């Protein structure tokens, strides 16, 4: 038996060998990098041995690849190193404190650096690309034009009518469909059975139900699924693509009285699917605030989360045209906590900073300017991922200072194992600045800390989904006390056009229900949740709601009961559609009046 090949030998042979003539099964680089358990155990044993064992490993490397072996020996002779002994195990370390075995592995995979997620093309390349697109627009005159999503104000039912008829027919031809659907005046109507379970004999008003509906495939086409006024069981409204849907069902008082003696039975709900096409989310920015001046949307003046008693970090700001590069040092982190289910849980970490421009002659951002920050930066501690970014910024023109805060985002869970000492001491971000008037949507704080979605990163994505944003749980949500919880986020916005956000459910979520409501400018974001059982816990960072852009109308969905149904009102020769007390804007909900 010969000597077993080492990991370095395997990698050397794999790199130097020519490609085989026959295809081989795909193997990830991680599988190549991580040795099997037997090899890993041998590596640990080799680390615990004396210098003789380590020289033997060097000889194996030199035998497999003399250049690699010579390079390793030269590095050891030149760099030296130190030996740290813990108990009976001697660990060889280089000057930078990294164990040599780990340093060797990092050297082999040195091309797998974390900077790959943050690299961008040079500004002159982007500028030249945009100019080339403009030249192409002139050549394309009279043909198609480049899409400007903010210009689209309304959708038309005629663009989808034949497709709606088609998916209705597909639904009716399914073998498991007992109640046929019908397409009438732009909407799909269907009846669906709901199982009433009263085996305990006490009766209840709220239940949970699954329904199967026609399904749409267009990226921009959704449905408002809700019950009509003729239903004895009211399915609470959903925004869905169709297919299998789960929602909370509410029984009216008459149905509850009639079903007291029934243990398990069937009731029917009359459903309507209203075609829904949201507006594409516009480009956003965050205005610079000034001391003593109210922020965007009526937010408190100054910097969000700023605490005078806490120490400030130091920021150094360098201007590169319209871009500000900010380097923050000496950060001191403060934990924000909330009491949930009798326990205080960490919701996020926050640190504040202040500083001046590197160049005394460089101009500070003005009150009429707004900013867009670089993407969230990922950090890892004990295998737990969390992200950090700038939260809010304030410009003090008198002191020529820039004040601000950085914070962890709600898009990831902040574990109790992470403490303030584990948080980064230094941080860096850049700001793209421009005039506020160039942005239709302006948030009071960095929305990347609260939401996720392609609409926040459109310039860097191919074929992004610009029709929705996802809201994440800011803390662990417990339903042990009551099945209904309302989550409030201190984030506001101002929108110049007559648009607002529709807060809706997550697609295909059956563990909890998110109440449909309208989030208007100047108000904090509120998300109301119901759960099926009181033992459910929604961890921090879990998606809890979806945001859609709609044309602003009158009213809102104030209650979630048997009155939350689809209805229409006729007045002065016009027909208006409502969901509960909320008027459905005709620009987004594509309905035609009944004849």
Swiss-Prot record:
Its main location: host cell. InterPro entries: Herpes_U10. The keyword Signal applies. Residues 1-23 form the signal peptide. GO terms for biological process: symbiont-mediated suppression of host innate immune response. The keyword Glycoprotein applies. Plays a role in the inhibition of host innate immune system by targeting host CGAS and promoting dissociation of DNA from CGAS, thereby inhibiting the enzymatic activity of CGAS. Belongs to the herpesviridae U10 family. This is Protein UL31. The lineage of its organism: Viruses, Duplodnaviria, Heunggongvirae, Peploviricota, Herviviricetes.
């Amino acid at each position: 038996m010969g000597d077993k090949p080492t990991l370095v030998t395997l990698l050397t042979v794999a790199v130097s060998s020519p490609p085989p003539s026959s295809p081989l099964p795909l193997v990830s680089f991680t599988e190549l990098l991580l040795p099997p358990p037997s090899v890993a155990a041998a590596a640990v044993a080799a680390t615990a041995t004396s210098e003789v064992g380590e020289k033997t490993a060097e000889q194996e490397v030199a035998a497999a690849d003399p250049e690699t072996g010579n390079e390793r020996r030269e590095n050891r002779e030149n760099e030296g190193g130190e030996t740290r002994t813990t108990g009976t195990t001697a660990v060889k370390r280089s000057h930078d404190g990294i164990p040599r075995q780990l340093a060797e592995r990092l050297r082999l995979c040195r091309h797998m650096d974390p900077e790959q997620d943050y690299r961008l093309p040079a500004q002159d390349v982007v500028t030249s690309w945009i100019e080339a697109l403009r030249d192409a627009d002139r050549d394309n005159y009279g043909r198609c034009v480049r899409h400007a999503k903010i210009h689209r104000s309304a959708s038309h039912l005629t663009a989808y009518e034949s497709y709606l008829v088609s998916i209705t027919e597909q639904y009716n031809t399914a073998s498991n469909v007992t109640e046929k659907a019908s397409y009438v005046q732009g909407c799909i109507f269907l009846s669906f059975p709901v199982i009433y379970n009263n085996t305990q004999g006490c009766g209840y008003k709220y239940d949970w139900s699954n329904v199967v509906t026609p399904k749409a495939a267009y990226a921009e086409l959704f449905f408002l699924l809700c019950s009509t006024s003729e239903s004895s069981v009211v399915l609470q409204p959903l925004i869905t693509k169709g297919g299998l849907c789960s929602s909370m069902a509410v029984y009216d008082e008459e149905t509850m009285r009639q079903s007291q003696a029934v243990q398990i039975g069937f009731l029917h709900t009359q459903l309507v699917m209203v075609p829904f096409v949201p507006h594409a989310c516009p480009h956003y920015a965050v205005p610079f605030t000034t001391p003593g001046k109210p922020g965007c949307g009526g937010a408190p003046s100054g910097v969000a989360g700023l605490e005078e008693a806490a120490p400030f970090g130091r920021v150094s700001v360098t201007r590169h045209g319209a871009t500000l590069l900010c380097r923050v040092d000496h950060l001191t982190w403060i934990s924000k906590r909330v009491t949930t289910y009798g326990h205080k849980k960490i919701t996020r970490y926050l640190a504040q900073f202040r500083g001046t421009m590197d160049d005394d002659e460089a101009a500070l951002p003005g009150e009429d300017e707004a900013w867009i920050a670089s993407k969230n930066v990922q950090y890892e501690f004990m295998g737990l991922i969390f992200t950090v970014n700038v939260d809010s910024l304030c410009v003090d023109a008198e002191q020529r200072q820039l004040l601000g805060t950085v914070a962890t985002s709600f898009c990831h869970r902040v574990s109790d194992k992470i403490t303030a000492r584990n948080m980064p001491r230094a941080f860096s971000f850049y700001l793209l600045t421009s005039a506020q008037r160039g942005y239709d949507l302006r948030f009071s704080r960095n929305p990347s800390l609260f939401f996720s979605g392609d609409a926040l990163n459109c310039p860097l994505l191919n074929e992004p989904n610009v029709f929705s944003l996802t809201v994440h749980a800011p803390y662990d949500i417990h339903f042990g006390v009551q099945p209904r919880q309302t989550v409030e986020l201190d984030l506001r916005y101002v929108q110049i056009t007559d648009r607002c956000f529709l807060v809706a459910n997550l697609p295909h979520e059956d563990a909890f229900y998110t109440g449909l409501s309208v989030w208007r400018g100047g108000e904090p974001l509120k998300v109301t949740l119901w759960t099926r059982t009181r033992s459910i816990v929604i961890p921090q960072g879990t998606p809890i709601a979806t945001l859609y852009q709609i044309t602003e109308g009158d009213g809102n969905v104030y209650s979630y009961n048997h009155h939350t149904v689809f209805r229409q009102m006729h007045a002065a020769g016009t027909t208006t559609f409502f969901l509960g007390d909320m008027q459905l804007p005709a620009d987004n909900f594509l309905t035609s009046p009944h004849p």
